[in-house]
Amino acid sequence: MSEQTVQASGQPTKARPKREFGKARPAEQPFRYPLEREYVEPDWRRIPGYRDVTKEQWESAQWQRAHTVKNLVEFKRALGDLLPEDLYADIERDQRERATMPMLIPPHMVNLMNTDDLWSDPVRRYMAPAFSERDPEFPSHPMASRDSLHEADMWPVEGLTHRYPTKVLAEMIPTCPQYCGHCTRMDLVGTDTAQVLKYKFELKQQDRWEAMLDYLRRTPMVRDVVVSGGDVANVPVERLKDFLFKLFEIPNIRDVRLATKALMGLPQHFLQDEVLRGYEDIVKRAHERDIEIAVHTHVNAAQQVTPLFGRAVRALLDMGYRDVRNQGVLLRGVNTTPQDLLELCFMLLDHAKVMPYYFYVCDMIPNAEHWRTAIWEAQDLQFAIMGYLPGFATPRIVVDVPFVGKRWVHMVNGYDRVKGISYWRKNYRTSIEYDDPEALTRDYPYYDPIRTLPEEGQAYWREYLAKQRGHELQPV
């Protein structure tokens, strides 16, 4: 009898199964690993403005801040002939007619650009965008707004956004060591541009911080605080310690996250002795209070992962910070192919020990349509990156839906692909919906970039805009 032997009693018993092996072998994959990209610090001396800069100067946070590029003239002075004249003129026009953020780029970030081809360089594209890169017909979506997530609407006190039931965002300061062109807080962060007069905090800084702490003491449902800005790297470390030590004394606070793009953009800041001592004091106090504390950073391109960044990350991890996590933004022309995303995630994970955490669909701020992706494109990207990274390090691609919050891109409740309108639901009320009986049953809309729509959908939005302009032109 097949696969059986017979005992002396005449009863059949199964034989031990045998398996053939050796037929499996590595297959060709859409993404190839290991990476070909080197983990190196680019030589800053290739850049004309930095040719005589010593290693000691380059690794000095004070030198980096003092020589940060603050305008296009300084950008040209740093890059010299590496910045093509036509690109200079294109960026200059963008600064006049489209930019929602001022230019502020530390030398370290300039050095991360591919100076052999600045036109196509992903870092330049989002730090110093050119006018010709913007969408020519729809630079802004008709539904775009300066505070696209309505964070200020959810301030119980100035600068503290209470959107989720148990979590808040503390906007400590309105400045960063570097300004990204796609900043979701363009209404608040940075100095004015030709297009945008920024909101200015009304309370004095210390009064604002004390009001935040007082609200948290009075609101025991909050357990999780994201300490952001701006960027915490622009908060003097002793002042940051003072705020955090008071925060740690609030019994309901169990998780704290410090948000800083400067960990990548200005790692020299985090390698200063006084900053290292301050951050070590912070994590020790958090552990004494049995509070989990982590750091969130913002890296969008694989070439931004360098040894200086890795040193700064390891210093924080060695102190006892739970994680350093990356929250990137999907930006067309920067990182919206599976190859781009996977290469970035492996560089973060393999070399810098940073956890790929989230990639956000770029928010609907003014003049950002050329960067934004459609929901279906984000869904395709999520599918394409599955299976390569460890499960715990596979980033979730999310959309931040106004009045809803983060949603995985596959959680859409309805989707009109022609008009590019997706619909989303939620299971909690924001802090401005406490008396709204329909908050948990309403469909909340989100909008794809118009250029990603079929012609019928684009025609719909052209007609919509024409009607809007008609209303604006009617006499009052």
Where are these regions (language model features)?
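Short cysteine/histidine-rich metal-coordination sites, predominantly Zn2+-binding motifs
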Residues: 196-204
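Conserved AdoMet/S-adenosylmethionine-binding subsite of the radical SAM
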Residues: 206-220, 224, 230-389
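C-terminal accessory extensions appended to soluble enzyme cores
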Residues: 2-20, 26, 378-476
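Active-site glycine-rich loop that binds ribose-phosphate moieties when present
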Residues: 119-120, 126, 203-214
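Flexible, acidic/Gly-rich N-terminal and inter-domain linker regions that tether
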Residues: 2-162
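Short helix/loop capping segments that flank catalytic or ligand/cofactor-binding pockets
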Residues: 180-182, 191, 267, 433-434
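Iron-sulfur (Fe-S) cluster-binding segments and ferredoxin-like electron-carrier domains
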Residues: 185-195
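N-terminal pre-triad scaffold of radical SAM enzymes
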Residues: 102-105, 153-186
